[in-house]
């Protein structure tokens, strides 16, 4: 074995069941039973550090790379996992060299830079302690002890898309609910087994305004989930879930430990 043996690098980009697989060898190869096609990929150096901001991986790729079709116009809402494996040509030894997520794509005239983030970027931080507050701090449809526990499927409205244009989408089914019913919610549909989602900014009649553009073919059935303004009234009348309300609507606005001698 030589210490200067060449390595072949395999890149696997996974979006649910959809995969884009590329190899740096100037020919198509099969690895672990999966086909990899050649792509002219140049990467940054790899750093292993306790500072997570340094454990990144940047890839310089051609602008016609099929993977980048997901980022033309608008980036996908779903995380795209990114795995770099490499194989030593002299003895076939394989190692997983880097695992993470695509953070963003930067475009230029003749190339694109894929910015990869480490796995810790997708983990939920500890965050702040829960405040004592009037509004409910719980995540709508979250499940578990002390959570919202509304079954989102009981709130779903299926709607057949009439048209989409920019940030708006139109469907007759949305008019069956009062204006604002879907504010803060989202729409969800499937394309070739891949689930797409778009947050809803506002709802008026048959029209939703979305946070990001959605290219949804006319006639597609989308699942629509209503949002929540996190007040007790909405929790009770809209979701029938006052028993799990996480705020304290009767919290006094005057501090009993303040300087006012008369409380």
Regions found by a protein language model. Name each.
Residues 1-263:
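Interface-prone segments of viral and bacterial extracellular assemblies
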């Amino acid at each position: 074995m030589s210490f200067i043996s060449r390595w072949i690098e395999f890149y696997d980009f996974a979006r649910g069941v959809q995969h884009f697989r590329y190899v740096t060898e100037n020919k198509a190869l099969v690895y672990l039973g999966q086909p990899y096609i050649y792509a002219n990929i140049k990467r940054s150096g790899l750093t292993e550090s306790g500072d997570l901001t340094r454990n990144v991986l940047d890839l310089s790729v051609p602008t016609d790379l099929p993977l980048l079709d997901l980022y033309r116009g608008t980036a996908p809402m779903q995380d795209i996992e990114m795995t770099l494996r490499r194989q030593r040509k002299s003895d076939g030894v394989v190692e997983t060299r880097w695992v993470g997520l695509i953070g963003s794509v930067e475009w230029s005239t003749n190339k694109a830079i894929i910015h990869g983030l480490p796995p810790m970027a997708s983990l939920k931080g500890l965050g702040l302690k829960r405040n004592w507050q009037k509004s409910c701090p719980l995540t709508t449809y979250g499940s578990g002890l002390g959570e919202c526990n509304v079954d989102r499927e009981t709130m779903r409205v299926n709607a057949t898309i009439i048209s989409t244009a920019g940030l708006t989408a139109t469907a007759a089914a949305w008019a069956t609910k009062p204006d604002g019913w879907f504010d803060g919610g989202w729409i969800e549909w499937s394309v070739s087994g891949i689930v797409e989602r778009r947050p809803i900014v506002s709802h008026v009649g048959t029209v939703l305004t979305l946070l990001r553009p959605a290219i949804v073919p006319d006639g597609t059935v989308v699942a629509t989930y209503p949002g929540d303004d996190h007040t007790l009234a909405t929790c009770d009348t809209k979701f029938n879930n006052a028993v799990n309300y996480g705020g304290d609507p009767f919290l006094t606005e005057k501090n009993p430990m303040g300087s006012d001698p008369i409380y």
